[in-house]
């Protein structure tokens, strides 16, 4: 698990749009948020374009029902074009996305935060290059590192700031990734429960899940309560 430091990493976070959003899981409100970071030096192991040192970050929130009276279900989902849109079976991303939307709909309330961190933060083209390396026998972590990136370049400050902007201070977080729990807690948002987002494994991504568990610390057993 990575260590997160408290602090406001953005000069501003603003709501840019809001609209009705019917889906096959039910009606949501869809919100668009834009975060502008304070000046900082980009991490060379996570930057595909050093000239773009401080680009605005965009994120979408799907909100269903009353999320203010009790700690809501929250899912932080990182964009995965290949899985979420094309149904790739190299990963479990689409299955996790659909599980989150279905769970929120069954609960009648919750928040899905969809952020643009394709390929665990390295971007779409490097992600496809990593696929090619995986075809040659490297695993998902080794492929990222072979390309000069960290195993996981994602940071989760923007979801935390959006939750605070929405007045959310406690959540039931749907994740298998301890880093997401740590990021929210370090931002002052209490994770009262970790809800599992484990999906049924398939042969095509069984190794991928094993690597996430063994090398990245992801949790593959059932959910638990968190009071940290």
Regions found by a protein language model. Name each.
Residues 1-228:
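Catalytic domains of riboflavin
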